[in-house]
Each structure stands twice: as structure tokens, then as C-alpha cells.
Amino acid sequence: MAANFWESSHCTEWLLDRNKIEESNPKDKQYLTPIELKKLRTHYCFVIQNLGNALKLRQRAISTAIVYFKRFYLKNSFVDCEPRLVAVTCLYLSSKVEECITQAKKCAAKMKEIDHSFNYLMNDILECEFFVLEELDFCLIIYHPYKSLPFYLQSSGLDPASIEIIWGIVNDSYRTDVCLLYPPFVVGLGCILLGSYLLKKDIKQWLSELNVEMKDIWEVSKDLIDYYEFEKQQSLQNQSELDLLYNKLPIRNKK
């Protein structure tokens, strides 16, 4: 494990450019429009979040699982690798990495409660885990904004109510691609910038004293605004509509 972010595989191997992300899910694009594919990608972030909540896992483990899922589908497509199974497997794997271990059998049973059409069992998850590990190149340590955020929030002078909203924005950020594009401290600052704007809090002086590159921080805020607009316009949790999109894909080995 690297002693700090800048020496880690997260920094040296898994910070990507937008073109790399846009090239992902190539086979799925034969069956879904870009908007439909974006809806499904976002939906599985909700799936992981909801399953993690049901299993009472820490938010950090849930966020790590979402990053695993996003990284996995940079190399793979939904049609080749069943996304519900991969989502559950990523969460099971992250629970071990983040030291809040749950059982594969429990993951399968709880997912079945959430999605009655989920027919995968413990052995399917354990088998899938080896494939996920290979596709992640065994790079399992994920750095999150959660570590640097308390320091920035304390020094910003924002009130407790504003801070709580910003924590929510950070969790929402995992439904975007900013975790693949920017270092975690940049993501955290982008969330603070957006939160202060929405709450009409002036933090310009504080930001100027941080001596950080503002371009990427603005980009993170813009990506989050785009996501919230997308969420307003699309039925991201309309299960019947999402089922229709899922069924448009000729997924191999679907149970």
C-alpha cells in the first residue's frame, strides 16, 4: 500500500481523461443510446448504495465499491458481464478491503430482497470476485475526499448545516465520473465550492488562500451541476423503465 495518494496506484494508474471514459462500454453502445447508457450506469451506483445501506456498511465501503464498479466497466461491457452480479461482487470485495466485512451469502440474500429477479448465489459472487480482481489489476486501495474534507470544512468557516449538505454532495459525487478524473482533495474542494454556491456562502477569500489550481475544482463543480440537472430530467430510479433498458441488452449468462 502506498504511503500517500501521490505514490499510489490510484494516482499513477487510475486517474484518467474523459476520452478514456467515453470509450468504455463499447458493446453496450450497439443497443443503448448515450443517455440510456448513462442512466444504467447511474442506476447501478444507486443499486450499490441501497444494498450497502441494507447491509449496514460504512459509506466509505459503499463508495469504494462504486469506484470498483466504474473501473471494471472501463474495460468491460454490460452485455459481457452481468452488472447486477458485478455490483454485488464489488460491494462484497470492498467490505473486506475497508474492514467492515460482510458475507457473500448475506450479500446475495439481501440483494434478492431488493431485486426479486436476482438469482445469483454465494458461489457466483465468489467466482466473480476473482474476475473483478483481475480486471482491477489488484489495485484495491481507493483514496476518498473523506480524509481531507474535515480539514477543509473546518478552515472554511462554514456553519454545521452547510457542512452537512456538503457531505451529501460528496456522496452524490460518486454517481458522476469525478472519482475517475481528479484527485480526491480536488473532488472535495469542488463539492465545497458547489455547496457554498447553492447556499449563497462567500468563500472566495478562503479559496484564494489555499493556493490550489482552481480550473479542476470548477470542473468538478460543473460535473456535479450537470449530474443534478440530469437527475431532474431522467427517471433514474423508475424501476420499470430501468428494467426495459436492462432487457434491451443481450447479456450473456444472465440468470
Swiss-Prot record:
GO MF term list: cyclin-dependent protein serine/threonine kinase regulator activity
GO CC annotations, alphabetized: mediator complex; nucleus
Disulfide bonds listed in the record: none
Main localization, broad class: nucleus
Keywords carried by this UniProt record: Activator, Cyclin, Nucleus, Repressor, Transcription, Transcription regulation
InterPro entries the record matches: Cyclin-like_dom, Cyclin-like_sf, Cyclin/Ssn8, Cyclin_N
Biological process, per Gene Ontology: positive regulation of transcription by RNA polymerase II; regulation of aggregation involved in sorocarp development; regulation of DNA-templated transcription
Subcellular location: Nucleus
Domain Cyclin N-terminal: 46-134
Family: Belongs to the cyclin family. Cyclin C subfamily.
Subunit and interaction comment: Component of the Mediator complex.
Function: Component of the Mediator complex, a coactivator involved in regulated gene transcription of nearly all RNA polymerase II-dependent genes. Mediator functions as a bridge to convey information from gene-specific regulatory proteins to the basal RNA polymerase II transcription machinery. Mediator is recruited to promoters by direct interactions with regulatory proteins and serves as a scaffold for the assembly of a functional preinitiation complex with RNA polymerase II and the general transcription factors.
Protein name: Cyclin-C
Organism lineage: Eukaryota, Amoebozoa, Evosea, Eumycetozoa, Dictyostelia
